[in-house]
Amino acid sequence: MEVIAWVVASGSVTESMSAGIVRLLFKKGDRQDVKNYRPVTLINADYKLISGCVAARLSAVLPDLIHMDQTGVPGRRVSDGIHMVSDTIEYCEREGVCGAIVSLDQEKCFDRVDHEFMFKVLGKYGFGPVFIGLVRSFYAGATSRVLVNGKFSDEIQLGRGVRQGDPPSSLLFVLTAEVLAS
């Protein structure tokens, strides 16, 4: 609890908390193709406790902030989105309504989140300066090193994106994307 209080009071995390180790997890296909790996960031345990508190806060309010058609929110199921599309197709066929279905996939979407935009979105949705400052501290000076075959890369400064494997990352992404969808 002292660490959390210190981070909130100081508005910053320690250097060891902001440093991540990226492991590449093989998905499928050709092991020589880097696209067949998913990066996951391993993060300091103290940091994960603090970011877990942020994730819990976000999880509690996201269902009220995110449109009901968005299924990337705790308590909602992907199958709900599938049923909605199926019902829409059925309605259009039954009523003779012309339509089109567009499926968009944002490649490397977690890597493309602009931090300043994300902080503004948090403010737009009513998160206070202490909460936004805490999230901001997660990204100020954040670095990662990639671990491959037992060897570390040089340190990489994280100028944008949310970290794979960080508890609030998917929630911050969904909240940021909601502004673009509405």
Q: Which ranges hold each PLM region?
A:
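Conserved pre-catalytic core of RNA-dependent polymerases
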Residues: 1-182
